[in-house]
Structures are given as structure tokens and as C-alpha cells.
Swiss-Prot record:
Modified residues (Phosphothreonine): 37
The protein, known as: Peroxiredoxin-2F, mitochondrial
Recorded GO CC terms: cytosol; mitochondrial matrix; mitochondrion
InterPro entries named in the record: PRX5-like (IPR037944), Redoxin (IPR013740), Thioredoxin-like_sf (IPR036249), Thioredoxin_domain (IPR013766)
Swiss-Prot/TrEMBL GO biological process terms: cellular response to oxidative stress; response to oxidative stress
Gene Ontology terms for molecular function: peroxidase activity; thioredoxin peroxidase activity
Source organism per UniProt: Arabidopsis thaliana
Gene name of this polypeptide: PRXIIF
Note, other: The active site is a conserved redox-active cysteine residue, the peroxidatic cysteine (C(P)), which makes the nucleophilic attack on the peroxide substrate. The peroxide oxidizes the C(P)-SH to cysteine sulfenic acid (C(P)-SOH), which then reacts with another cysteine residue, the resolving cysteine (C(R)), to form a disulfide bridge. The disulfide is subsequently reduced by an appropriate electron donor to complete the catalytic cycle. In this 1-Cys peroxiredoxin, no C(R) is present and C(P) instead forms a disulfide with a cysteine from another protein or with a small thiol molecule.
The protein's assembly and partners: Monomer.
Transit peptide: 1-30
Subcellular location: Mitochondrion matrix
Length: 201
């Protein structure tokens, strides 16, 4: 009898853990950013910072770019990643989009955008090092407000990165999200590459 009760308790615990895991993945990836979401309404008052040198930042008086300027009336592919100069981001994620840029243009995409929780000056140097600035528009989310608004923020203090973002991608048409993908973990690169989003356009 005691053994039967123990087995039932263990089974209940396993089911609870499995349900929690499913809920965690769902809420993390899709609670605020889902198909049909107006990305500008989901992040009201939020602006991004276009990648540039420090001198360009000074001359522009550290101006920012409203989300409406980025998305309204345009077909945009946007992907977010944990940080400039990090492994998967540098070796796989950005190169994936850079190498497929002609395919995006052939599908009528107006811009391919990379956004990261970094200042725009660090991102600028990184983009130049990757030789990707001519193909991809890079933006900083220096205070993380954009990702927090979309429910895509992620604490990566364990990797000495602090508050960052999930690894994700989306196809956005006139501000409305048409497709969105979020990795199970920021270190994964399974569903957010260029080939996946190309198949969703």
C-alpha cells in the first residue's frame, strides 16, 4: 500500500514538473509576443538606438528611433540575441541572416534587423567586425525596455552578462507580428535562424 502511494506521489510530481516546463516555455516565448501582436503597441513609448560610433552618437545628440519608424508600412524580419561578441550570436546567428540577405530581399523584405541588450556603440563595433552592417540593420536596446515589454527579457547573470534577452526571431508586417520563434534556451540555435523565418514569410 505504502509503495502504491509513493508511486502515485512520484507520478503526480512528474506530471506537475512536466506541466510547469510546458507553461514556462509557453509564457516565456508567447505571452506578450504572438502572431497578431502589434509590436509597437506592445512596447508603447519604447525606442531603439541605431548602431553607430561614439562620434556619430554625439553628433546625433544620442537620438533614438521610435518603433513606428522601424515597423510601420514595412515588411521586417527582426531577430534578437543575448549579446554582442558572444559565441552563438557571432558564429551562427548573425552569419545566418547575413548569408541569406538576398533571399529576404527576393521575398520583398524591406529590412532585416538585429537587436540586442547592448549600447549602440558596442553593437556598432561588433557589426563592423562581422562585416554585416551593409546587409543587416543593428539596433541597441541599451536599457532592455524593448525586450521587457515583449516578455523576452532574460537574466543571464550566471554567464556574467546580467539582464539580457532570449534568442528569438519574428516576421513583422506593418507592425503586426506574422510569425515568431523563441529558443528554449539562449544558448540554443534551432528555430531562430534565417532559414526558419524564410519559410514562414
Amino acid at each position: 500500500m505504502a509503495m502504491s502511494i509513493l508511486k502515485l506521489r512520484n507520478l503526480s510530481a512528474l506530471r506537475s514538473a512536466a506541466n510547469s516546463a510546458r507553461i514556462g516555455v509557453s509564457s516565456r516565448g508567447f505571452s506578450k509576443l504572438a502572431e497578431g501582436t502589434d509590436i509597437t503597441s506592445a512596447a508603447p513609448g519604447v525606442s531603439l538606438q541605431k548602431a553607430r560610433s561614439w562620434d556619430e552618437g554625439v553628433s546625433s545628440k544620442f537620438s533614438t528611433t521610435p518603433l513606428s519608424d522601424i515597423f510601420k508600412g514595412k515588411k521586417v524580419v527582426i531577430f534578437g540575441l543575448p549579446g554582442a561578441y558572444t559565441g552563438v550570436c557571432s558564429q551562427q546567428h548573425v552569419p545566418s541572416y547575413k548569408s541569406h540577405i538576398d533571399k529576404f530581399k527576393a521575398k520583398g523584405i524591406d529590412s532585416v534587423i538585429c537587436v540586442s541588450v547592448n549600447d549602440p556603440f558596442a553593437i556598432n563595433g561588433w557589426a563592423e567586425k562581422l562585416g554585416a552592417k551593409d546587409a543587416i540593420e543593428f539596433y541597441g536596446d541599451f536599457d532592455g525596455k524593448f525586450h521587457k515589454s515583449l516578455g523576452l527579457d532574460k537574466d543571464l547573470s550566471a554567464a556574467l552578462l546580467g539582464p539580457r534577452s532570449e534568442r528569438w526571431s519574428a516576421y513583422v508586417e506593418d507592425g503586426k507580428v506574422k510569425a515568431v520563434n523563441v529558443e528554449e534556451a539562449p544558448s540554443d540555435f534551432k528555430v531562430t535562424g534565417a532559414e526558419v523565418i524564410l519559410g514562414q514569410i
